[in-house]
């Protein structure tokens, strides 16, 4: 089992944001005063149902929607069986003559029912087909299971319906016009009246998000740390990403809720996974479980594949007939949705961001049409269109032309060909501006590798972005291939990472009082998971492998603070937000250099400063991007970056009329009303429509504010990276040996122990020759606490890392050892208590 060695260390809880005296609070309520919603045991499921009912626009819409899902499954199975066994295709294709007349010389008119077999013949053909009977039995069992689940869900959601009516006081007719922030604010208030959770006197917005997104946060962290096998290098195709709904379902089945999963229930990780003494045994158990689930997927592959093909055919056949170019459209891939998702971001919040970025993303990808392909498409459209025009003209002259064999088929195929060819012909009025489009995309999706900036016109950037924003046809093809590929990925790619996954859940799980076991990354704690290149320098104590990649901790914290302005962040997060606010003020003040003549004047840049609070919020982003793109080559690259940062800071300051005059120190700037009341959580108006309109407008301002912060933080990150290029690590790609470690050779004296074991997925710092004393202190502390440094005793010095040829990271000038330091099977590690994160 030496191949399972990995380098994770225990991550201790960092802070407590519970009110003084409530760390171990257990609220007691007299028996007679208990409400129906007092002490709900499974709050994860309860809050998830509350959220789902809100997103499905009420009980009636949810009920009808699930009924149609049952009917849809039944229709697909029944209609497919009818087409296979109850249709005489010889009559349908006119290979067999049917005569309804008593006189053979009279003309025959075949009707559609003539091709239907009698019920007795149809039943006999079904009974003779053994494979069809097997498929129908399996489909019937599955449908009955879904029917029972539907009835159970209806009973459960009726309780949620009552909760909305009586506890939250929101009628179902008004629910479609209430934002989630309004519902969430009423849940927080309901906790004070009904004590939904007895372990805390008050619920916070973060508590509710943790309950709803517990497993989703783990998935985002696993993708962020590149622990799931999603990237593959194929001959002739290069590096590809494969992540489908079926593969994601299997990941969640294995890790979260399936039989033998890592979690005891929805809110608690099993006790044995919280300690390191049995890590190898647990990894072997997980590896075996992955193997059996992979074998089960392989056995069920034919049935799943048939269902995928039938469902895709019935779903997209009509769309292709109506819009042949639909498959040429693009959509956000499942990997892109997981990669771009913030910690603690609900599904509708993510969808809203991606919807805003869809049009600029489509325009960006359309900039890369091949000139040769365009030439072929123009000529193909000309030839196909010419033939199509002649056939249409003949049909208009005499409609009997359609009665000629294959004429209608030819017309249809030619129409599809013309439509497809036109999709490859660019708009003659389109302007090629990939850098500007990529910056607009960044404003909405918030995440982007550094090497994309300045290289938006390169095909490599386009290919990497296509992994996030793929063709609809590629999405359908991947879903069709998923039943075949998923068992192979589980058996041959996921199993070797069993120990890394076990260590990940042990080291990055904290127990939050009143919430349960959550992913520590979801705490958005810049001290434990911040990155020094993302404005967290001096505020983070995280080692390299404890840092979240791509600035996800910092951007997630900013997004959550803007989305939930009533949330009180912990001390370290408050300091980070306060520092960022001060930096925005300084850079915004520096934007006045344009009026002083020190920098070239720009009309678009000047228009930003004249924007008022009632202006269209999205115009701020357009002005910032356009102003930064129109300066020309007269400015140096560094000066352009500084001016762009000043533009964004000036745009952020334009939100000041919406902010209250006296905001708490460290609070993030929020879109608020002039009276200081957060209108995103409590809309008011003379009617439901006025309140809904006000909520939507303020939501747009909040989204624009976050977009500007994303641009600003990326610009700061870029400048800090250029200042210390040797320290920057972005998007650490997996190697062929990721997840595997070589077996140990020799004894303890064969090599010098490393402070942090190295792996193929995470870089680590090794002792530098120039600082032996500091390294000794730092290494000794890291060996015990996984790289967390005491800020009061051990200063953090800059580290220099280089990529190893076969994966992994080592410090410049130091030899890379292939043997990580072993984690003891028994002993002191097993004596450590489970982590308790008091919130």
UniProtKB/Swiss-Prot annotation:
For the modification Phosphoserine, the affected residues are 14, 16, 18, 656, 735, 738, 741, 828
Task: Report intramembrane spans.
Answer: 291-301, 320-328, 471-480, 484-492
Start-end of Acidic residues biased regions: 737-747, 823-832
InterPro entries, per the entry: Autophagy-rel_prot_9
A single Gene Ontology biological process assigned to it is: protein localization to Golgi apparatus
Q: Which residues lie on this side of the membrane: Cytoplasmic?
A: 2-61, 155-290, 302-319, 329-371, 425-470, 481-483, 493-839
Membrane topology summary = Multi-pass membrane protein
Keywords, A to Z?
Acetylation, Autophagy, Cytoplasmic vesicle, Endoplasmic reticulum, Endosome, Glycoprotein, Golgi apparatus, Lipid transport, Membrane, Mitochondrion, Phosphoprotein, Transmembrane, Transmembrane helix, Transport, Ubl conjugation
Q: Phenotype on deletion? A: Lethality; mice die within one day after birth caused by impaired autophagy. Mice also show aberrant activation of the innate immune response. Fetal mice display significantly retarded growth. Conditional deletion in brain causes axon-specific degeneration: mice were born normally, but half of them die within one week, and none live beyond 4 weeks of age. Defects are caused by impaired autophagy in neurons, leading to progressive degeneration in the axons and their terminals, but not in neuronal cell bodies.
Question: Could you list the residue ranges that cross the membrane?
Answer: 62-84, 129-154, 372-397, 407-424
Q: Which residues are glycosylated?
A: 99
List compositional bias (Basic and acidic residues) regions by residue number: 724-736
Q: Name one Pfam family in it.
A: ATG9
Post-translation changes: Ufmylated in a DDRGK1 dependent manner.
MF terms from GO for this chain are:
phospholipid scramblase activity
Keyword Disulfide bond among UniProt keywords: no
Location in or out of the cell: Preautophagosomal structure membrane; Cytoplasmic vesicle, Autophagosome membrane; Golgi apparatus, trans-Golgi network membrane; Late endosome membrane
Assembly, in brief, is:
Homotrimer; forms a homotrimer with a central pore that forms a path between the two membrane leaflets. Interacts (via cytoplasmic its C-terminus) with ATG2A. Interacts with SUPT20H. Interacts (via the tyrosine-based sorting signal motif) with AP4M1; promoting association with the AP-4 complex. Interacts with ARFIP1 and ARFIP2. Interacts with ATG4A; the interaction is direct and promotes ATG9A trafficking.
Q: Record's family? A: Belongs to the ATG9 family.
In Swiss-Prot or TrEMBL terms, this protein is called: Autophagy-related protein 9A
Species of the source: Mus musculus
Whichever gene encodes this chain, its name is: Atg9a
């Amino acid at each position: 089992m030496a191949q399972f060695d990995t380098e994770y260390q225990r991550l201790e809880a960092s802070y407590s944001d519970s009110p003084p005296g409530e760390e171990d609070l257990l609220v007691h309520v007299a028996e007679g005063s208990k409400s129906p919603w007092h002490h709900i045991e499974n709050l994860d499921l309860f809050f998830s149902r509350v959220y789902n009912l809100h997103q499905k626009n009420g009980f009636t819409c949810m009920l009808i929607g699930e009924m149609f899902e049952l009917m849809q499954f039944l229709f697909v199975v029944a209609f497919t069986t009818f087409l296979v066994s109850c249709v005489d295709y010889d009559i349908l294709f006119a290979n067999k003559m049917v005569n309804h007349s008593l006189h053979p010389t009279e003309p025959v008119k075949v009707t559609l029912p003539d091709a239907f077999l009698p019920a007795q013949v149809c039943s006999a053909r079904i009974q003779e087909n053994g494979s069809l009977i097997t498929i129908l039995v399996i489909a019937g069992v599955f449908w009955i299971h879904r029917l029972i689940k539907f009835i159970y869900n209806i009973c459960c959601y009726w309780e949620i319906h009552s909760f909305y009516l009586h506890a939250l006081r929101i009628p179902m007719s008004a629910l479609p016009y209430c934002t989630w922030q309004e519902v969430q604010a009423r849940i927080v208030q309901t906790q004070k009246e009904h004590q939904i959770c007895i372990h805390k006197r008050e619920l916070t917005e973060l508590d509710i998000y943790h309950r709803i997104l517990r497993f989703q946060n783990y998935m985002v962290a696993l993708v962020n740390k590149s622990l799931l096998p999603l990237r593959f290098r194929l001959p002739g195709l290069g590096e590809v990403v494969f992540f489908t709904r079926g593969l994601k379902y299997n990941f969640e089945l294995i890790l979260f809720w399936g039989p033998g999963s890592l979690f005891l229930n929805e809110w608690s990780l099993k006790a044995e996974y919280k300690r390191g003494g049995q890590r190898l045994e647990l990894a072997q158990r997980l590896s075996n479980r992955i193997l059996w689930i992979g074998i089960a997927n392989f056995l069920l592959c034919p049935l799943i594949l048939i269902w995928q093909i039938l469902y895709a055919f019935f779903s997209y056949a009509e769309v292709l007939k109506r819009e042949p170019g639909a498959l040429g459209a693009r959509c956000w891939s499942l990997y892109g949705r997981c990669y771009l998702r913030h910690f603690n971001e609900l599904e509708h919040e993510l969808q809203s961001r991606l919807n805003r970025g869809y049009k600029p993303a489509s325009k960006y990808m359309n900039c890369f049409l091949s000139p040769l392909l365009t030439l072929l498409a123009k000529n193909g459209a000309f030839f196909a269109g010419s033939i199509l025009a002649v056939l249409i003209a003949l049909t208009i002259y005499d409609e009997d032309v359609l009665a000629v064999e294959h004429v209608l088929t030819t017309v249809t195929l030619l129409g599809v060909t013309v439509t497809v060819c036109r999709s490859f012909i660019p708009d003659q009025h389109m302007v090629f501006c990939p850098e500007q489009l990529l910056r607009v995309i960044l404003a909405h999706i918030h995440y982007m590798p550094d090497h994309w900036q300045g290289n938006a016109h390169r095909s490599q950037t386009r290919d990497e972005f296509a992994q996030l924003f793929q063709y609809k046809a590629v999405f359908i093809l991947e879903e069709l291939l998923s039943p075949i590929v998923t068992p192979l990925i589980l058996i041959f790619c996921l199993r070797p990472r069993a120990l890394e996954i076990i260590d990940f859940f042990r080291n990055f799980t904290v127990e939050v009082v009143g919430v349960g076991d959550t992913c520590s990354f979801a705490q958005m704690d810049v001290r434990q998971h911040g990155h020094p290149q993302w404005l967290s320098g001096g505020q983070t104590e995280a080692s390299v492998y404890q840092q979240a990649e791509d600035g996800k901790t910092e951007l997630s914290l900013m997004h959550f603070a803007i989305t939930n302005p009533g949330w009180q962040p912990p001390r370290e997060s408050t300091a980070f937000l306060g520092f960022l606010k001060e930096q925005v003020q300084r850079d915004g003040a520096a934007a006045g250099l344009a009026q002083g003549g020190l920098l070239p004047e720009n009309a678009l840049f000047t228009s930003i400063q004249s924007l008022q609070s009632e202006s269209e919020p999205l115009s701020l982003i357009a002005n910032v991007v356009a102003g930064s793109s129109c300066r020309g080559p007269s400015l140096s690259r560094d000066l352009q970056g500084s001016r762009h940062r000043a533009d964004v800071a000036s745009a952020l300051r334009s939100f000041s009329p919406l902010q209250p005059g006296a905001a708490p120190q460290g609070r993030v700037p929020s879109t608020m009303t002039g009276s200081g009341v957060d209108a995103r959580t409590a809309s008011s108006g003379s009617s439901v429509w006025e309140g809904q309109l006000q909520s939507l407008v303020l939501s747009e301002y909040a989204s624009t504010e976050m977009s500007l912060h994303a641009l600003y933080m990326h610009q700061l990150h870029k400048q800090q990276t250029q200042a210390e290029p040797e320290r920057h690590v972005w998007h650490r790609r997996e190697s062929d040996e990721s997840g595997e470690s070589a077996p140990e050779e020799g004894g303890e004296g064969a090599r010098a122990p490393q402070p942090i074991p190295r792996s193929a997925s995470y870089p680590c710092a090794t002792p530098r020759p120039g600082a032996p004393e500091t390294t000794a202190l730092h290494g000794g502390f890291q060996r015990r606490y996984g790289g967390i440094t005491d800020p009061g005793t051990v200063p953090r010095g800059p580290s220099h890392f280089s990529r190893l040829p076969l994966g992994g990271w080592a410090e410049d000038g130091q030899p890379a050892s292939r043997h990580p330091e072993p984690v003891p099977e028994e002993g002191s590690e097993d004596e450590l208590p489970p982590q308790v994160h008091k919130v």
